[in-house]
A protein has these predicted regions:
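Active-site pocket scaffolds in enzymes
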Residues: 20-36, 108-254
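Histidine- and aromatic-rich segments of cupredoxin/plastocyanin-like copper-binding domains
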Residues: 1-100, 105
């Protein structure tokens, strides 16, 4: 879990070792995935296994390579001191199959929404980061019907990432694409072929509720509102942003 208010982490092992990823925010993967590094935005979670049987007697450091300007010491996260002998035999293994995972078919989407991450200023001239240029207390505009599938295109107009978090529902990342003004129609809706997206990174392929929206890119996600109706929220998970109007109501209607 990245519990930082704003800092992202780009994590790897100092010896070049492998992480065996077994899950994302909202569940296990179908099969384990071997990764050498991963990025965690605020509120993102990842489930990992490290096989230390290969590193007998070694000292290994978990390193942070995030390009964000670090405070002193934030590049060194944790040190593992691997012993030479086990007190008891370890017979544990990572299963080849973890949990059946039924992907959401974007072709079944009842609606596509283009949602812009942008900024304005308040009446004192202070910067406000907003979702679709709307304040928190304005009426809900994201109102999916219960048991429907939707695709959301999150358009990040900033020069830095925003971690976008949806309550209630899990989603899958379809992919990302650098956008230009020509990619939008006269109403600001994104128009393109889903096949033109760059696929999500290996550690993002699972059921999620937080996504890193890259600067200058559209990030497309698909979700199925199939279990609950009512009032929820979606927001940027940078604490200073979500507490200053980068949050919107999400109403699932019966």
């Amino acid at each position: 879990l990245n519990a930082s208010n704003i800092r992202a982490y780009d994590l790897r092992l100092s010896n070049g070792g492998v992480f065996h990823q077994i899950g994302t925010e909202l569940g296990l993967l179908h099969h384990p995935v071997d990764i050498s590094s991963f990025i965690l935005e605020p509120a993102e979670r990842i489930d990992l296994v490290i096989d230390f049987s290969e590193y007998k007697g070694q000292e290994i450091t978990l390193l942070n390579d995030s390009p964000a300007p670090p405070s002193p010491g934030t590049e060194l996260i944790m040190k593992f001191k691997v012993g030479n002998e086990l007190k008891y035999p370890d017979t544990s293994t990572i299963p080849e199959e973890l949990m059946p995972f039924h992907k959401i078919d974007p072709a079944l989407a009842a609606k596509e929404r283009t949602l812009h991450l942008d900024e304005t200023t308040d009446h004192y001239g202070r910067v406000l980061h907003l979702l679709n240029n709307k304040m928190w207390d304005e009426p809900a505009t994201e109102t999916p019907a219960l048991d429907t599938i939707e695709i959301w295109h999150l358009v990040n107009h900033f020069d830095f990432p925003h971690p976008i978090h949806l309550h209630l529902v899990h989603f899958e990342i379809l992919g990302r694409k650098v956008f230009t003004e020509e990619d939008f129609d006269e109403y600001g809706n994104y128009k393109f072929n889903l096949e033109s997206l760059t696929p999500p990174l290996d550690f993002e392929k699972g059921p999620k509720d937080v996504v890193r929206t890259e600067p200058g890119q559209v990030t497309s996600i698909v979700m199925h509102f199939k279990e609950h109706c009512g009032d929820y929220v979606w927001h940027c998970h940078i604490l200073e942003h979500e507490d200053n109007d980068m949050m919107r109501p999400l109403r699932v209607e019966a």
